[in-house]
C-alpha cells in the first residue's frame, strides 16, 4: 500500500493523519488499513473509512479503560480523536454527519486528557464579546505563574489537533 492518492488533497490529508504518529496520534498500520478502504476521490468513502477506524479504536480505548489500562486507553483515545477529525475533514458544512463526527473527536480527546493524567484545563477565552474554547497546558499542578503561549490554528484545524 502506498501512502498517497492520485488526488493531491486526499494524499495531503492522508499524510497529515500519518504524521500524528510522531506524537502518538496515529499508528501507521491503522492509517494504511484505513486508506485501503477509501475509493479515490470519494468523500463518502473517506468519511466512512475514517469514522469506522475511529469507532473501532474508541471501543478499544473503552475496553482498555475498563481493564484499568489507563495508558493504553489514553493512547487509543488520542488516535480515535485524530481519526474522527480526519473523517470530518471533507464533509460539507451542512452535512448532518459533521457535528456528530466533530463531537466524537472532541469527546475522545477529552477522554485522552483524563486518562493521560496531563495537567490540562479546558478554558474559555474572552474575545470580542464572546468566548472561544481552548486548553491550558501546565507543566505541573502548581499555581506558579509562567509564560503562556497562545496557539491558534487555521480554518481546517481543530483546537484538539494543536
Q: Residue locations for each model-derived region?
A:
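Short, glycine- and charge-enriched coil/turn segments that flank and shape catalytic ligand pockets
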Residues: 67-69, 141-144
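N-terminal cap/lid segment of alpha/beta-hydrolase-fold proteins
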Residues: 48-50, 54-57, 100-143
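Short beta-strand element of the alpha/beta-hydrolase
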Residues: 138, 144-154
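Long amphipathic alpha-helical segments
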Residues: 16-86
